UniProtKB/Swiss-Prot annotation:
Entry GO MF terms: rRNA binding; structural constituent of ribosome; tRNA binding
HAMAP family linked to this entry: Ribosomal_uL1_B
Protein name in UniProt: Large ribosomal subunit protein uL1
Subunit structure and binding partners: Part of the 50S ribosomal subunit.
UniProt entry tagged with the keyword tRNA-binding: yes
Free-text function comment from the UniProt entry: Binds directly to 23S rRNA. The L1 stalk is quite mobile in the ribosome, and is involved in E site tRNA release. Protein L1 is also a translational repressor protein, it controls the translation of the L11 operon by binding to its mRNA.
GO biological process: regulation of translation; translation
Keywords, alphabetical: Repressor, Ribonucleoprotein, Ribosomal protein, RNA-binding, rRNA-binding, Translation regulation, tRNA-binding
Family the UniProt entry places it in: Belongs to the universal ribosomal protein uL1 family.
Taxonomic lineage of the native organism: Bacteria, Pseudomonadati, Spirochaetota, Spirochaetia, Spirochaetales
UniProt cross-references to Pfam families, sorted A to Z: Ribosomal_L1
Record has Calcium as a keyword: no
GO cellular component terms given for this protein: large ribosomal subunit
Length: 226
């Protein structure tokens, strides 16, 4: 474990690690112990009780956006390519973009593809997969409905998923945001995660929830969703 600085230790000392804070108090405390001089991102970590065969994965558009606009790349041909440009995609193409990405170009944040392009896009698996950007029907990034896909991405639609240890890590705000807006994003995100509870799971679905800022310690949050 890396050595923590004096300011982190001071902030850590103000957090009762045995206490479950309600979300309002957790947000207040998070801002009170903030010591970084930049606008920190606020993250949530949800520990789930999952079996090995369970998958928790989906996308969400939070009610209060805080991230910079995403650079949207669309793989499409012909009329579909024209549609993508009309709907505001940042980059649109087919083989030209595939070759460009193979050469090391990476100036994009999210990738969408029409179904007919996936055979060719699949050649980028080692590159896009490593960045978590391979188009997938489950995340609504393999589709012929480019209008809805692009519009929702422009509104901030973002993927979340549980890792192999059953932990979901997700950014849901900025420290400069109004407390109520941070709370709204928190509640919307947890609500969406709860909807992904596996139908055959017995017992509690959520084991624990923590929030933290970029540089700050974790704060355990009380929750009623199980």
């Amino acid at each position: 474990m890396s050595k923590k600085g004096k300011k982190y230790i001071e902030a850590f000392s103000k957090v009762d690690k045995n206490k479950f804070y309600n979300i309002e108090d957790a947000i207040l405390l998070l801002k009170e112990i903030k010591f970084a001089k930049f606008d920190e991102t606020i993250d949530i970590s949800i520990n789930l009780n999952l079996k090995k065969n369970h998958t928790v994965r989906d996308t969400i558009v939070l009610p209060n956006q805080f991230m910079k606009p995403k650079r949207i790349l669309v793989f499409a041909k012909g009329d579909r390519a024209d549609e993508a440009r009309a709907f505001g995609a940042t980059h649109v193409g087919d083989d030209d973009l595939i070759n460009k990405i193979k050469s090391g170009w990476d100036e994009f944040d999210v990738v969408v593809a029409t179904p007919d392009m996936m055979k060719d896009v699949g050649r980028l698996g080692p590159i896009l997969g490593k960045r978590g950007l391979m188009p997938n029907p489950k995340t609504q990034t393999v589709t012929n409905n480019l209008k809805d896909a692009i519009n929702s991405l422009k509104k901030g639609r973002t993927e979340f998923r549980a890792n192999k240890n059953g932990v979901i890590s997700f950014s849901f705000g900025k420290s400069s945001m109004d407390n109520e807006k941070i709370k709204e994003n928190y509640e919307e995100f947890v609500k969406e995660v709860v909807k992904k509870r596996p139908s055959d799971l017995k017992g509690a679905f959520i084991d624990s929830i923590y929030i933290s800022s970029t540089m700050g310690p974790s704060i355990k949050v009380n929750f009623v969703w199980r």
